[in-house]
């Protein structure tokens, strides 16, 4: 699957390193929560994982292939839902017709189910949607793309409480043993019930890298009398 090895990155030659000798790996069938405050490097790490940014040193490999090479065989296995993005002035149906062929396992059935859960249909035009609605439409497309890696950057931003509930339902219904999902967020309460593994980062450093089952095993609950 996807493996980050000794990665270092900065946004310029004279800029300080945001990541240095950073290593991390994804396993199939796991939903990862990438947690940290704003500015901790979460979005940058997602872009490095998707091949949209290139590391200064080290590698990000998917099945042994460097994602920075941006080979079609690698890119068709990765889909990213950015925190903010622009979409063309077309309908979702037109967007699917143009872009679905890039993803060999694209499923119109999954797309239909996701849109139903979001109370949408593929006739919607992107330019007529709010940012939250655009995110639902694009999230549905990325889930339908059926890639082995799905990266989501602050997916609940712009969602009201019912929309957050819809999103959790959609993600849970479309997770599989072959897929890895990474959800980057600083609002852990929105997604905590979905997570199998937690990666906590700050200033480009790993503060925690552990499965949720290990966290549960280490917790001790002490009963205290009510005052």
Q: Positions of the model-derived regions?
A:
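Helix-to-loop junction immediately C-terminal to a conserved catalytic motif
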Residues: 50
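Conserved ABC transporter NBD signature motif
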Residues: 58-69, 73-74
């Amino acid at each position: 699957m996807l493996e980050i090895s000794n990665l270092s990155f900065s946004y310029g030659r004279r800029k300080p390193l945001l990541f240095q000798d950073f290593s991390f790996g994804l396993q199939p069938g796991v939903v990862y929560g990438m947690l940290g405050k704003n500015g901790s490097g979460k979005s940058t790490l997602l872009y490095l994982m998707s091949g949209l940014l290139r590391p200064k040193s080290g590698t990000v490999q998917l099945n042994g292939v460097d994602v920075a090479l941006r080979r079609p065989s690698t890119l068709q296995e990765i889909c990213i839902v950015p925190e903010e993005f622009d979409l063309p002035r077309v309908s979702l149906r037109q967007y699917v017709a143009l872009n679905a062929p890039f993803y060999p396992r694209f499923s119109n059935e999954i797309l239909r189910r996701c849109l139903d859960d979001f109370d949408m249909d593929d006739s919607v035009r992107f330019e007529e949607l709010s940012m939250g609605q655009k995110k639902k439409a694009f999230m549905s497309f990325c889930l339908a793309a059926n890639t082995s890696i799905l990266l989501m950057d602050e997916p609940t931003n712009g969602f009201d409480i019912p929309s957050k509930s819809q999103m959790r339902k959609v993600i849970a219904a479309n997770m599989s043993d072959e897929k890895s999902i990474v959800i980057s967020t600083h609002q852990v309460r929105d997604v905590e019930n979905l997570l199998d593994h937690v990666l906590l980062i700050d200033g480009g450093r790993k503060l925690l890298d552990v499965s949720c089952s290990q966290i549960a095993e280490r917790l001790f609950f002490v009963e205290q009398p009510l005052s």
